[in-house]
Design a protein with these regions (language model features):
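Short amphipathic alpha-helix adjacent to the substrate-entry channel of hydrolases
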Residues: 50-68
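Catalytic nucleophile-loop/oxyanion-hole region of alpha/beta-hydrolase
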Residues: 49-50, 70-107
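C-terminal catalytic histidine-bearing segment of alpha/beta-hydrolase fold enzymes
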Residues: 217-275
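Primarily recognizes the serine-hydrolase "nucleophile elbow" in alpha/beta-hydrolase
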Residues: 91-168, 173, 177-178
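Conserved alpha/beta-hydrolase "acid-adjacent" motif
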Residues: 202-211
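N-terminal cap/lid segment of alpha/beta-hydrolase-fold proteins
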Residues: 1-32, 165, 254
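Short beta-strand/loop motif that positions the catalytic acidic residue
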Residues: 189, 195-197, 201
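Short beta-strand element of the alpha/beta-hydrolase
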Residues: 33-42
Length: 275
């Protein structure tokens, strides 16, 4: 495996991505093109949770996927999250397509994975980047490449559905209402989705994921949805690997199944397949 940190630019604003590239397997008679996952971690739009970066990357590397971690635009005193975050996703996808000469990449099998706030970015991208009018409006047409599917883990979907808790916080994320309700951006062209959450999520109510799943169904977009009966927000792997020290509430045997469930789903939709 090769780990690479790369500075990219979107609208002249630099940002960093970390790529985990699989090495070719010498035993194979010919190079095998592998799918790519791009991870947008959570953190309430104010930081990027490291519990949702490398531990997740290692799981999907083991399934034969190259993995990139994208620390998308956060909200701060001078910046809103949108639309810059979507431009960063688009530029990252484009950069992946530019690496085919260096790595064995299948550019038709790029998966976006978002946790919590990162799920809001990914869900919005899945709608806006597949809508020709909005692609032009937000200047996403300047980038090459497209994603094939998305995975959402306890995602923020609707900024009026429990997180954030005030209108002031919502406006710090973005004042552009196009991004407030990701479910309303879903179109018939959106990509297939795997979504999971817990019914007892105390920070981002499960209504968020439900709204998105219903929107996908309305537009006949393939979706697999798992709502686990109990568990806190921010479980990540839900195992000892991502457990915060001394806090057993981050252990959840039921929810920890999501990696194998998502891998099975990726196999079903032919993102992961036999060589």
């Amino acid at each position: 495996m090769q780990i690479e940190t790369q500075e990219l630019k979107s609208n002249e604003q630099p940002f960093l991505v970390t790529a985990y590239w699989l090495d070719p397997i010498a035993d194979f008679e010919a190079p095998v093109k592998q799918p790519v996952m791009i991870i947008c971690p959570g953190g309430g739009f104010t930081f990027h949770s490291e519990r949702e970066t490398t531990p997740i990357a290692l799981k999907f590397l083991a399934e034969g996927m190259h993995v990139l971690v994208l620390p998308y635009q956060l909200r701060d005193a001078t910046h809103e999250v949108y639309p810059m975050a979507l431009n960063q996703v688009a530029r990252t996808i484009e950069w992946v397509t530019e690496q085919t000469g260096r790595h064995s990449i299948d550019t038709d099998r790029i998966v976006l994975t978002g946790f919590s706030a990162g799920g809001h970015v990914v869900a919005n991208y899945n709608g806006i980047a597949t809508n020709p009018l909005l692609v032009k409006q937000y200047h996403l047409d300047q980038y090459a490449g497209q994603h094939a599917a998305i995975i959402l883990a306890y995602p923020v979907i609707d900024l009026d559905a429990g997180f954030p808790t005030t209108s002031a916080e919502k406006n710090l994320i973005t004042q552009d209402s196009q991004f407030w309700h990701a479910q309303t951006n879903v179109t018939d062209n959106a990509k297939p989705a795997f979504v999971w959450q817990t019914a007892t999520d105390e920070l981002v109510p499960a209504e968020n994921s439900l709204r998105y799943v219903l929107a996908l169904q309305k537009h006949h977009i393939p979706v697999e949805y798992h709502l686990f009966g109990s568990g806190i927000h921010g479980l990540s792997l839900a195992t000892h690997v991502t457990q915060k020290p001394g806090k057993t509430k981050y252990l959840n045997k039921g929810a920890s199944q999501w990696i194998s469930l998502a891998t099975n789903w990726l196999t079903q939709i032919q993102v992961i397949h036999n060589n």
